[in-house]
Amino acid sequence: MKTFTATPETVTRDWFVVDADGKTLGRIATEIATRLRGKHKPEYTPHVDTGDYIIVINAEKVTVTGNKAKGKTYYSHSGFPGGIKQISFEKLQAHKPEMIIEKAVKGMLPKGPLGRAMFRKLKVYAGAEHNHAAQQPQVLDI
């Protein structure tokens, strides 16, 4: 019996919606990253994007444990000397809550073209509304 290898033409992708309300950031991010890679499917192939589309709603209500809300810091750099910027979890959650989940999931995906293709299948929204109703997403409990 030959080993099955998925090809981009044979991959079927589903749409799932995840409610992040009251969920812990790391717990939800690991499950999302697994689904984006397609590791939950029996036809998973490491060099082929076999993952599903994931819609995350209520990103503004995601939680972290302990004192990380005050202590967790996100860094970015402009590329110029002295251009490093930092922002705390609390401020980023108030300013751009989608970015918190995006950064957590992106760090768990492969680096390179395949990882970027997987990341493009993640759609994050701060509130409870999303504009992907036409795709008929299934609710995914995490």
Curated annotation (Swiss-Prot):
InterPro entries hit by this protein: Ribosomal_uL13, Ribosomal_uL13_bac-type, Ribosomal_uL13_CS, Ribosomal_uL13_sf
Pfam families on file: Ribosomal_L13
Gene Ontology biological process: negative regulation of translation; translation
GO molecular function: mRNA binding; structural constituent of ribosome
TM stretches of this protein: none
Record keyword Repressor present: no
Keyword annotations from UniProtKB, A to Z: Ribonucleoprotein, Ribosomal protein
GO cellular component entries: cytosolic large ribosomal subunit
Keyword Zinc among UniProt keywords: no
HAMAP family assigned: Ribosomal_uL13
Family: Belongs to the universal ribosomal protein uL13 family.
Subunit structure comment from the entry: Part of the 50S ribosomal subunit.
Chain's role: This protein is one of the early assembly proteins of the 50S ribosomal subunit, although it is not seen to bind rRNA by itself. It is important during the early stages of 50S assembly.
Protein's UniProt name: Large ribosomal subunit protein uL13
Originating organism: Shewanella sp. (strain W3-18-1)
